[in-house]
């Protein structure tokens, strides 16, 4: 391997948290090269970020630097960080530098790939408008996902991004014939652990990997240094790109893209860069573009990516979520006000968008029903001030009817999740697109005006709502 041949040795000159300065004799490693040393008996990888002159480089550490001392020897590998790729990754968990962390022995790799790859060229890219059915009513109706597209789940703290991404994994990855890659970027270790065991229990993966496993996991969780969190998304993407290049349709889940930006901003200040708006790194758009442009569908295969994006203080104009918007085909916005009403998934039907909601793609009926639902909800929203001040009695008969239908639609957009079954006790529901359209069409046309609001809350298809209404009537009698 070329990396072994270069083995030029330098010495640690300075350690400032996650940033380490290394000086070489008459050699200067290239930017993004991986340098290796040992720290407390463990392999420590440093990535070159800056040239400081006089053969000194400033590096970002991929693991804790506690115990690292000045004068310690560091070897230049002569190549960027490389990670194992191939079918041997399925069912396994690796970290940012490709080491297995699931205590199941070494990873069986076909080849080693650099985590820094160029984005596919214009001619290699492929665009095909096809819908990805999720079985979640609000998504399929109002902001349908594209096969081979990029989907962002935006939401503040605790409104249900991770639960929604886990439900999508449950509904799509389990039914999906191809492979999935999950990148845990700076999120809770507990959730990563739960997901790993959930995959084994549901048969998506076999314990210890190997034949029959369909998902690869790449983790760099909250407790990791910023270097690992800033690069683990690229590691996951490299694994996904390999499967795509083999002609697979890959699902790539990232939780959470904001932590990638946050890690970049943590190391940016230590590297001496002048911060930009709100203290973020000046290279925010470049970093995001370098990651997002690689997540794309080529003529060889497709990558459909679902990314959870944390919204700091529920402010969608914050530079981190705002930079992500430009790269996405569909945006699903989770709203705290909807979560407070107890409506889950707390998707904002008026704030979520998709370029697939086009009559040429979804068909005239679907498009007309979706727009009608949105117009009823928008009318209800504009009437809320009047209702708050004057009460319902001051509304016209037509407006009263609109409000009644809107409240039913709002409740019918909720749905019990499979992954939340343990918390709610309600069995999860998958709703077919045709049933979703039929149900909302009936609601908009007033076919269900005689049913109570409560009948539409946390049900699957419209038949269930009718059954629930009959049950409620029988209980009340």
Swiss-Prot record:
Its catalytic activity?
ATP + H2O + 4 H(+)(in) = ADP + phosphate + 5 H(+)(out)
Oxidoreductase keyword on record: no
GO molecular function terms noted in the UniProt entry: ATP binding; ATP hydrolysis activity; proton-transporting ATP synthase activity, rotational mechanism
- Keywords of this entry: ATP synthesis, ATP-binding, Cell inner membrane, Cell membrane, CF(1), Hydrogen ion transport, Ion transport, Membrane, Nucleotide-binding, Translocase, Transport
The record's listing under InterPro entries reads: AAA+_ATPase, ATP-synt_VA_C, ATP_synth_F1_bsu, ATPase_a/bsu_AS, ATPase_alpha/beta_chains, ATPase_F1/V1/A1_a/bsu_N, ATPase_F1/V1/A1_a/bsu_N_sf, ATPase_F1/V1/A1_a/bsu_nucl-bd
One Gene Ontology CC term in the entry: plasma membrane
E.C. designation(s)? 7.1.2.2
Q: Write down the CDD domains for this protein, in alphabetical order.
A: ATP-synt_F1_beta_C (cd18110), ATP-synt_F1_beta_N (cd18115), F1-ATPase_beta_CD (cd01133)
Q: Quote the PROSITE patterns the UniProt record gives.
A: ATPASE_ALPHA_BETA
Identify the domain of life: Bacteria
Q: Where are the transmembrane segments?
A: none
The protein's location, in the record's own words, is: Cell inner membrane
Record membrane topology:
Peripheral membrane protein
Family listed: Belongs to the ATPase alpha/beta chains family.
What NCBIfam families does its record include? atpD
Subunit (UniProt)? F-type ATPases have 2 components, CF(1) - the catalytic core - and CF(0) - the membrane proton channel. CF(1) has five subunits: alpha(3), beta(3), gamma(1), delta(1), epsilon(1). CF(0) has three main subunits: a(1), b(2) and c(9-12). The alpha and beta chains form an alternating ring which encloses part of the gamma chain. CF(1) is attached to CF(0) by a central stalk formed by the gamma and epsilon chains, while a peripheral stalk is formed by the delta and b chains.
Entry function: Produces ATP from ADP in the presence of a proton gradient across the membrane. The catalytic sites are hosted primarily by the beta subunits.
- Identification of the protein by name: ATP synthase subunit beta
Q: Which organism is it from?
A: Mesorhizobium japonicum (strain LMG 29417 / CECT 9101 / MAFF 303099) (Mesorhizobium loti (strain MAFF 303099))
């Amino acid at each position: 391997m070329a990396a072994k041949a270069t083995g030029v040795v330098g010495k640690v000159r300075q350690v400032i948290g996650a940033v380490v300065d290394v000086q070489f004799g008459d050699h200067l490693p290239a930017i993004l090269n991986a340098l290796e040393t040992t720290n407390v008996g463990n392999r420590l990888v440093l990535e070159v970020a800056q040239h400081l002159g006089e053969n000194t480089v400033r590096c970002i550490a991929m693991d804790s630097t506690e115990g690292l001392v000045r004068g310690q020897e560091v070897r230049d590998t002569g190549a960027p960080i490389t990670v194992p790729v191939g079918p041997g990754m399925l069912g396994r968990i690796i970290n940012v530098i490709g080491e297995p962390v699931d205590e199941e022995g070494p990873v069986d790799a076909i080849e080693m790939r650099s985590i820094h790859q160029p984005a596919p060229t214009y001619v290699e890219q492929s665009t095909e408008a096809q819908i990805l059915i999720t079985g979640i009513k609000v998504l399929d109706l109002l902001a349908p996902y594209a096969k081979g597209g990029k989907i962002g789940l935006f939401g503040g703290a605790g409104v249900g991004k991770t639960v929604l991404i886990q439900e999508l994994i449950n509904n799509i990855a389990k039914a999906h014939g191809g492979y999935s890659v999950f990148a845990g970027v700076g999120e809770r270790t507990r959730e990563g652990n739960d997901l790993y065991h959930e995959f084994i229990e549901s048969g998506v993966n076999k314990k210890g990997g190997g034949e029959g496993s369909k998902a690869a996991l790449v983790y760099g969780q909250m407790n990791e240094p910023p270097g690992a969190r800033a690069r683990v998304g690229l590691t996951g993407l490299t694994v996904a790109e390999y499967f795509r290049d083999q002609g697979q349709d890959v699902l790539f889940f990232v939780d959470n893209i904001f932590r990638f930006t946050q890690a970049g901003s943590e190391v940016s200040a230590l590297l001496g860069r002048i911060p930009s708006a709100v203290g973020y790194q000046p290279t925010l758009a470049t970093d995001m573009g370098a990651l997002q442009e690689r997540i794309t569908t080529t003529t060889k295969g497709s990558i459909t990516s679902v990314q959870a994006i944390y919204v700091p203080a529920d402010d969608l104009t914050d530079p981190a979520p705002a930079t992500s918007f430009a790269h996405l085909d569909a945006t699903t916005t989770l709203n705290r006000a909807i979560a407070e009403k107890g409506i889950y998934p707390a998707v904002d039907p008026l704030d979520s968008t998709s370029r697939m909601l086009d009559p040429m793609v979804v068909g005239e009926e679907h498009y007309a029903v979706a727009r009608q639902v949105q117009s009823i909800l928008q009318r209800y929203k504009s009437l809320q001030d009047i209702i708050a001040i004057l009460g319902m009695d001051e509304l016209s008969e037509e407006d009263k009817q609109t409000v009644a239908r809107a409240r039913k639609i709002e409740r019918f957009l909720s749905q019990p999740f499979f992954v939340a079954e343990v918390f709610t006790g309600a069995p999860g529901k998958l709703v077919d697109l045709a049933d979703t359209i039929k149900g909302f069409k009936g609601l908009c046309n007033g076919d269900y005006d005689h049913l109570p609001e409560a009948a539409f809350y946390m049900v699957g298809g419209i038949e269930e709502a009718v059954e629930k209404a009959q049950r409620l009537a029988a209980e009340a009698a």
